Amino acid sequence: VGHSVEHYYLDDYAMVNLEGHKGDKVTIELIGAFLPEVVVEGLYAATDKTGLKVKSMTLEPIAAMNVIIPPEIRLINIALVDIGAGTSDIAIARDGAIVAYAMATVAGDEISEDIVRKFFVDFNMAESMKIQASGGTDSITYRDIFGREQTISKADFFEKCSPSVDSLADVISQAVCDANGQSPAAMFLIGGGSMANGLADALADKLGIDHGRVAVGGQEFMKNVDVGDRKLGPEYVTPVGIAVTACTNMAYD
């Protein structure tokens, strides 16, 4: 479903781009990304039911990389982590190329499930509480499973959620180190789960890197993309990346 070229060689000499050059032997080192056939068939079945057709397919970290960490800044050892609901997808850039992909099977739902248990609410209410927590008010109002309306301050809410945020940071930081071989020099967090309060700082602490080098990426970090006057948060990076990847013929048919 996708690939990333690490190095091109022409007659055993490293090249940035082979186009327009002549030689006797071409060598390409790349990382290929594969999905089980049943997963791909399931994706096609879902789109068929909506009356849509698949134009192209790619891997989410590849798509996000294309707009957040383009080739000109991949000399830096950067980790990109797309924290969704059920999984956290990881891509590692180093020495001018994308060198590794990984996935942690924990993400934003871990925090939602912790909220369910601690506040006696259903899952949808837990999601609503997370959304309220990212807003401008100082308190969060919710209705528990007994039908009682409750109010809690943001400070108390964040304190009660901090163990699950810390646990999520543990798993992600370990997966990043396993993929990279060590802590990266910097990290971009994208996806809805990346907005969890305190997650960026927790990851910086666990990886031993400066807090200023772990950023939650949104519109301001998108390269070579004009989204007009729209204010796009980190949850939009991957969808925009998928569109860019498809339009620039970097995806798979």
Please provide the spans of the model-predicted regions.
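Generic beta-strand/beta-sheet core signal
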Residues: 60, 83, 93, 190-192, ...
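Nucleotide/phosphate-binding catalytic cleft detector across ATP-hydrolyzing
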Residues: 1-78, 135-140, 144-158, 179, ...
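Helix N-cap / loop-to-helix initiation motif
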Residues: 53, 121-122, 210
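Short, low-complexity, polybasic intrinsically disordered segments
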Residues: 199-215
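Active-site lining segments that contact anionic ligands and/or coordinate catalytic metals
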Residues: 87, 182-186, 234-239
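Gly/Thr-rich phosphate-binding beta-strand-loop-beta motif of the actin/hexokinase/Hsp70
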Residues: 71-101, 115
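Glycine-rich phosphate-binding/hydrolytic loop that grips phosphoryl groups
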Residues: 215-253
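Phosphate-binding glycine-rich/basic clefts of nucleotide- and phosphate-handling proteins
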Residues: 32, 37-41, 45, 62, ...
